[in-house]
Amino acid sequence: MSLRSKGRPFAVATALVSGLALIAPATADAHRSHPPLAVQQVNLVSDQAGKAALQDADLVNPWGLSLGATTPLWSSNNGTSSSTLYSSAPGSSTATKVPTVRVTLPAPTGQVSNPGTGFVLSNGTTSAPARFIFATETGQIAAWSPQVDALIGPAEIKATTPGAVYKGLALATTGSGDRLYAANFAQQRIDVFDSAFHPVTLPHWAFRDSRLPRGYAPFNVQTLNGRIFVAYALLDAQTNDEIAGPGRGFVDEYTADGRLITRVASRGTLNAPWGLALAPAAWGLPAGTLFVGNFGDGHITVFRPSAYGGYHFAGQLRDTNGRTLAIDGLWALLQGTATTGGTDALWFSAGPDDETHGLLGQLRR
C-alpha cells in the first residue's frame, strides 16, 4: 500500500553495474579540493526482471533501510506494506533474501535498528527490546523483536499520532535515555518518543529553524555521529506529498535535544532531499563529509564540513562519462557493515517509475 500521489514522471536507464565519479565543482577551494572519486553502482535487488541480480516481488518502493552490527539489511517496502531482509557479503555482486523473516505493517517509511535495552515489547510470556522500529505514512510507530513477535507476521503498533504522516525515523541516545525522532511531514514538525514509546513534550524552540521558508516541512530525520540531521522538502498540503523541483530543499543539523547547530545546505542542488549518510572512511574524503540524496531528481550532493563550522558544497556524484548520477526515485543512503555489504559500501534504496517498482543496491569505490 502506498499513500503517495502519482504523476511525477522520471525516466532513468538502469543497469546491473555502472561507473560513477565524484567531481568537485570549479568553485571549490583549490587547496582543499580532492581528485575525482570513482565508484560503482551495483544493483542487487529489484521487483523487475533483469534490473538487478535478484528479483523479489516484495521490493516495491523500498524506502528506509537499517542494519544491526551483524544483521542482514532490512528494507521498508512501502509498496507492499512489508519489511524484508537481504544478505550480501562484502564485495559481492549478488544478494540473497532471508526467507525466514517477513514483517508486515502499513505503508512503512523510515526505520532504525535498536541495539539498546529500551523500547521493550511483551507478548504476555516473554519480554525483550524491539530490535527494529518503523515509522509509517499512517502516523504510527511500529516495532518488532525476534524474541517476542512472529518471524513472519505483523509488527506491533506502539504509538499512533492522529493526523501525522511520518516520512522518516531516527534513534539517538540522550542524557534522558534513548529517543526516537519521527519526521512528521503533514504536521510540519519532529515528533519525539521516549524508550517506552511515549511522546516527549518538546520546548517551543526544539527542532525549529526560524529561517526556514513557509511551507517546508521535515521530510526525513537521521542520526549521524550523535547529531540529528533534518532534510526539509516543500509540502503539498492537499496530498501530504513533497513538491519536487530544483532548489526545493534544505538540510539542518541539530543536537539531540533539538538545538539548531547549523544550516547544512539551502536550495542549490537540493530537490526534495531525503537520503542522508556520511561518506565511508575508505572513500578518502574528509571526516564528516555528508552525502545528501534527492528524491526529486535522484542526484547525490556532497557537503564537506568546514573548519569554522558549517558545510561547503563539494560536488555531486557523476558517472564516468561526466553525467550527473541519477537514481530514479532515490530514497535511503546507508553505510554497510563488515558483514553486510562492507564498510566501504553505501547501500541505497529507490522507488523508480513513480514508486511503482523497487531497486536496492550499493555504491562502491
Which sequence ranges carry the predicted segments?
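Secretory targeting and sorting signals
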Residues: 2-30
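Sequence/structural signature of beta-propeller domains
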Residues: 28-365
